[in-house]
Amino acid sequence: YWQRLFAPNLKIHPEFVAFHQKNYGTASYQDFVQQFKAELFKPEDWARIFEEAGAKYVVLTSKHHEGFTLWPSAQSWNWNAVDVGPHRDLAGDLAKAVKARNLRMGFYYSLYEWFNPVYKSDVQRYVTERMLPQMKDLVTRYEPDVLWTDGEWDHPAKTWQSEAFLAWLFNESKVKDQIVVNDRWGNDTKGQHGSFRTSEYGQGAASNSQRPWEECRGMGESFGYNRNENLEMYQSGEQLVH
């Protein structure tokens, strides 16, 4: 939403601007955090449903491309779920509930951020002072079984310092003997490196791979709730599995 609303280089989706102005006036995207309370979030219920559905592991989006973190990241001061909005460690609460059910817990983490001024002006400073400390903090705090990175496409793995981070992860971190990672560590790594390959809405045909793979998609045509989607747009359970 923020990208379509704000990105000056994307001269598409003017309906986003019209919708926003009609419903929210001059409010900024950041103002939405005041409405984000998560008052109905019950991680124990989520974990129970995951288990009853037959899931073996859970991956939560800890930070997407807008940079907001669901844990109290020191590098995301005043733009995380503890400092503002719910005032709650959503990532930690879900991790605790999932592990209590003996399920594997994982985190999605976006390497890049759409409008972070440091990322836009000095990528290496962003990687060194924000991205790497955040990923190490996430791993050290919650000891996940899966680290699912994304947003790698702007730069090769060398720029993201992926090799150095993975060396730490698999040699020094608390989860070095148990964690698995996906293949999105640079625009030169997808399908080539990682514990498993990832495709997205069928792109890349990872199912043809001899290596472990995971298909990344929503149940419908969106990754989140979209009130414009009807039931016909949703995949059946059999379609999602096969």
Task: Please give the residue ranges for each predicted region.
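Mature catalytic domains of secreted/periplasmic carbohydrate-active enzymes
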Residues: 1-242
